[in-house]
Amino acid sequence: INMSHFFHKIENMSSPHLLAAIDLGSNSFRLEIGRESHGQITRIEYIKETVRQGAGLDAERNLKLEAMQAGWDCLARFGERLRGFRPRQVRAVATQTLREARNADAFLARARECLGFPIEVISGPEEARLIYLGVAHLLPQSSEKRLVIDIGGRSTELIIGHHLEPE
């Protein structure tokens, strides 16, 4: 995740601030902490835990209790690390597995308590947009169209864009 595009534009920040991004993916949950200074974000910490939540969906598309517990345990550890952060410093998003799970609301209610921050289940197009922006900012500027492919645990995004804008 390129954190500079994970957050809404931050106005009037003259001193360095910490920001955190949490990605609840199908295979792993990730926590990335960065320091914002003068419009730039520098990563200072990255934690990735393999929870395999997508593999915990049963035939009826419900998350099994073991998969939910693994997610809650991970988010509790992330929450401990984020103690002292304010809600405006943290953005947590969930992707395909929680878009798909019929009992996502039950998981998310406790997940928010474990983490201590809101968790947003983002749409496929929003996930693709964030992926494209993150990749585009890491590549050299080009006037050519770009194709970015993200192969995830339960979904694959193909995003075409130009410069820093996904189409």
Task: Write out the residue ranges for each language-model feature.
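Metal-dependent DNA phosphodiester-chemistry modules and their immediately adjacent helices/loops
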Residues: 156
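Primarily the dimerization/phosphotransfer
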Residues: 27
